[in-house]
From Swiss-Prot:
Homodimer. The tRNA molecule binds across the dimer. Consists of two distinct domains, a catalytic core and a N-terminal extension that is involved in tRNA binding. PANTHER family: SERINE--TRNA LIGASE, SERYL-TRNA SYNTHETASE. Keywords: Aminoacyl-tRNA synthetase, ATP-binding, Cytoplasm, Ligase, Nucleotide-binding, Protein biosynthesis. Pathway: Aminoacyl-tRNA biosynthesis; selenocysteinyl-tRNA(Sec) biosynthesis; L-seryl-tRNA(Sec) from L-serine and tRNA(Sec): step 1/1. Gene3D superfamilies: Bira Bifunctional Protein, Domain 2, Serine-tRNA synthetase, tRNA binding domain. This is Serine--tRNA ligase. GO terms for biological process: selenocysteine biosynthetic process; seryl-tRNA aminoacylation. Catalyzes the attachment of serine to tRNA(Ser). Is also able to aminoacylate tRNA(Sec) with serine, to form the misacylated tRNA L-seryl-tRNA(Sec), which will be further converted into selenocysteinyl-tRNA(Sec). ATP binds at residues 260-262, 347-350. The keyword ATP-binding applies. L-serine binds at residues 229-231, 283, 383. GO terms for cellular component: cytoplasm.
Length: 424
């Protein structure tokens, strides 16, 4: 959520910044128009309340009953007008809030300009893609041949874009989650295990609403929402709190399944497990002082890259351009791993600084020093990593000519002695 004071005091700067992402300046003008209405109504309400207070004091001193009754009737009309204005004010404030929540975050000045993902900039690449002496298979062929991915039964259970992991495939998924959580603990993140359903207020605080409403699953009867990412519950751990400066930075990691309707991806990536309605992810999340947030973004990126490195996966890091930047982000790095069976790079982590955009919506503040006025924290989030794309990359990079898949060394302690997945 953007700062209304910034919009009010520097509208041209806000329009120019949002214009880099394709936002129509009329959206900013709408917020300003509601803001002026709201302030005009507030002025009128305050003037009438001041008048009522002054006249009330006069009435107490009046000896003429007729004159006093006339003043009382006059003030009753003033009270009715105040009540009417309060209703108008509430409606305008609701409209202004809705317009404000439609505005995305401002991109950082350093973010490269560009209309779409083709303008993203590769800033790092590590690990040489493996050279095969056979034609590598895509993961869906490997998974079915090894009997570790069952697409048919996934569809039978839940419909399209669902699947079942079996035997060592299910164990490999679990091993990845446990290993990632252990790794991030060593990197300085405190593990939390949160609910997978949240109140609507949490969706607003994490800025999933209103933009992504059509992509979310909701229980209408109880007004609870399935989480699309652990970012949602973890953001709201400190909603409506004032943190002490010495608590910061707070760094968390969390595993959750993620639920997305994928309406915006209809017809894309229909084969395999690359894009599903339910998938697992380990998330890294930070609450930090504003002056340190871009240093923390570099740590977040380094920690995600280290995860890929330890798994032995070739990866590259991109900085996203303005046209591909997420709604809440000011700056984002995407980390992609090579999938030789499909011949493409797969995004497994997106590391973003959202500055105070979520904190302002969720009212998360900190006190820079004892007695100081509270300020909004900055928040950052990054996948560490997303599954099943990490699973895809392991299957395709570690496949052997006989169709078996070697388990990465770091995962073997979590695999109960399994070092190679073979068809049994």
């Amino acid at each position: 959520m953007l700062d209304i004071r910034l919009i009010r005091e520097q509208p041209d700067l806000v329009k120019a910044s949002l214009g880099r992402t394709g936002v129509d300046p009329a959206q900013v003008d709408a917020v300003l128009a509601y803001d002026e209405q709201r302030r005009a109504l507030l002025r009128e309400v305050e003037q009438l309340k001041a008048l009522r207070n002054a006249v009330s004091k006069e009435i107490g001193k009046m000896s003429d009953a007729a004159a006093r009754d006339a003043k009382i009737a006059e003030m009753r009309a003033v009270g009715d007008r105040i009540a009417e204005l309060d209703r108008e004010l509430a409606a305008v404030e609701e409209q202004q809030y809705a317009a404000l929540m439609e505005l995305r975050n401002l991109p950082h000045p350093s973010v490269p300009d560009g209309p779409d993902e083709t303008y993203n900039v590769v800033i790092a690449q590590e690990g040489e893609p493996r050279t095969f002496d056979f034609t590598p298979k895509p993961h869906w062929e490997l998974g079915e041949a090894l009997d570790i991915i069952d697409f048919e039964r996934g569809v039978k259970l839940s419909g399209s874009r669902f699947y079942v992991l079996k035997g060592p495939g299910a164990r490999l998924q679990r091993a990845l989650i446990q290993w990632m959580l252990d790794l991030h603990g060593k990197q300085g993140y405190d593990e939390v295990y949160t609910p997978f359903v949240v109140k609507e207020q949490c969706m607003w605080g994490a800025r999933q609403l209103p933009k992504f409403r059509d992509n979310l699953y909701r229980d209408v009867e109880d007004d609870l929402w399935l989480v699309p990412t652990a970012e949602v519950p973890v953001t709201n751990l400190h909603r409506d709190e004032i943190l002490d400066a010495d608590q910061l930075p707070l760094r968390y990691c969390a595993y959750t399944p993620c639920f997305r309707r994928e309406k915006m991806s209809a017809g894309r990536d229909v084969r395999g497990i690359k894009r599903g309605h339910q998938f697992d992810k380990v998330e890294m999340y930070m609450f930090v002082r504003p002056e340190t947030s871009y240093d923390e973004l570099e740590k977040l990126r380094a920690d995600a890259e280290e995860t890929c490195r330890l798994l032995g996966l070739p990866f590259r890091t991109k900085e996203l351009c303005t046209g591909d930047l997420g709604f809440a982000a000011t700056r984002t790095y995407d980390i992609e791993v090579w999938a030789p069976g499909q011949g493409e790079w797969l995004e497994v982590s997106s590391c973003s600084n959202v500055e105070a955009f979520q904190a302002r919506a969720a009212n998360i503040r900190y006190r820079p020093e004892p007695g100081a006025r509270p300020e909004y924290v900055h928040t950052l989030n990054g996948s560490g990593l997303g599954l099943p794309r990490t699973l895809i990359a392991i299957l395709e990079n570690y496949q052997q000519a006989d169709g078996s898949v070697v388990i990465p060394e770091v995962l073997r302690p979590y695999m109960g002695g399994i070092e190679v997945i073979r068809r049994t």
